[in-house]
């Protein structure tokens, strides 16, 4: 499970010790965070490209535990494109990208207890439910964020402008 933010680390590692937490990224609080994390947390540092895609692919879920407003987190779209469902905080544009129980789950921002409950729920679904969720996440990304989807929307908008100017 890939995870980030203070909320995710507060109690989660000690409350859910059988989950391996993989934290990707860097920043000025890295050393402080390392000292606060449980033994089941692994800091991976900055990742990008194929290495990041491989981490997302191998994760059961990607946790986007933002505590500030994000409009359209690319992490969610990248995860969906790979077929990895997302657990995200119910804040900013995140809940607009997560279809509850279909492409992932949301939890209350800054609530490590709610995050723990959501992760526990996510980890308890059947293999069939997980496969369906993975397929739905990928379909959602392809339908809304693929090149083809973008081109079709762009063509539709251009056609609308052309049609309006014909009048």
Predicted regions mapped to residue ranges:
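Conserved acidic donor-binding segment of nucleotide-sugar-dependent glycosyltransferases
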Residues: 100-101, 105-112, 121-127
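A short, well-ordered alpha-helix in the C-terminal region of glycosyltransferases
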Residues: 121, 128-144, 150-156
């Amino acid at each position: 499970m890939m995870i980030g933010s203070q909320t995710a680390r507060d109690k989660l590692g000690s409350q859910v010790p059988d989950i391996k937490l993989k934290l990707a990224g860097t920043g000025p609080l890295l050393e402080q965070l390392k000292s606060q994390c449980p033994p089941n947390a692994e800091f991976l540092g900055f990742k990008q490209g194929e290495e990041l895609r491989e981490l997302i692919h191998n994760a059961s879920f990607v946790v986007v535990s933002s505590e500030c407003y994000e409009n359209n987190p690319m992490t969610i779209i990248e995860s969906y494109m790979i077929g990895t469902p997302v657990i995200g905080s119910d804040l900013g544009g995140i809940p607009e990208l997560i279809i509850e129980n279909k492409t992932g789950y949301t939890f209350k921002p800054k609530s490590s207890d709610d995050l723990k409950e959501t992760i526990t729920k996510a980890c308890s679904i059947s293999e069939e439910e997980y496969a369906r969720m993975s397929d739905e996440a990928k379909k959602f990304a392809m339908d809304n964020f693929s090149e083809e989807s973008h081109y079709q929307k762009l063509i539709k908008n251009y056609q609308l402008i052309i049609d309006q100017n014909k009048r």
